Amino acid sequence: MLIDRRKFLSLTAAAIAAPAFAAEGAAHGQIVTLPKFGPDSVSTSRIRIWLPPDYSEGGSSYRTLFMLDGQYAFAEDSDGVNFAADRRVARLAATGTIEPTLIVAIDNLEEDRFLQYMPQTIYDRTDAGVRAVIEGEINRVGKTALVSAQFIRFLATQLKPYVDTYYRTRPDRLDTAIFGASMAGVMAGSIFVEAQQSFGLGACMSPNWPIYNKQMIDYPELAAVWAAYFAQLGRPEGRRLWLDHGTQMMDAGMAPHQSAIAHRLTDLGWRRGCNLQTRVYDAGHAYAETATQMDEMLAWLLA
């Protein structure tokens, strides 16, 4: 049975509007909007970079955090309903909890968000049951194909090199993070796997592993595909991956998939608390407890 999309969207909107979503403190630093990269759909989204308060004062190089669903990244976005990542990173860096970090916020494709964030590789590797679910979502928006493979390629071969060229970054993968929530959390995991030469720090907040479908929660084929997919990471080699989900709403259905992924990674040498952090929050989907999740995630991932 499909999760009713109108109900899902209303629950998500309510969760986004929760008071816990805002971060305290004034915004600092500078936000720069990048020029458009090209005519294709995956590279025409608005992309902004947040520069830390001291960026213009010296010659230091910075870590970089790439954020999906970028229109909700900063404290002044979406009428205050946002991740407030600029405030959080500035505050955590000021206290020495994390290293100073640039933020690259990439807006989603709105109605085509699912096409952008559902991994093509998972569609290609799974069985007819899972493919039918994915095709149903593609048909719902009146399209014929995913664009996620193109999006990953754009990030790895165009956007990241551009940022590393024109801004003072530390380009090594161990200084480059990718973050997303819900379906963007799924895509953050895919970028971490498929562009692992570029992204060595990853965070998947409430990732929608079951693809909006209740039948996929305990569907062993899908959990096995996710686990095998992440096994492509091999040994950690200094990388870090954060996985979390809640216990309420649709988040409760993410547990089997997160468990399968985590077990496969620990078999490959990923140590919990060191290379791999898995959290379960007594909360609903993605945004409802962002004040807690975001601060804990940033403090661990960017320490």
Language model regions located:
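Secretory targeting signals
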Residues: 1-3
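N-terminal export signals
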Residues: 7-24
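Non-catalytic cap/lid and distal C-terminal segments of serine-dependent acyl enzymes
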Residues: 24-303
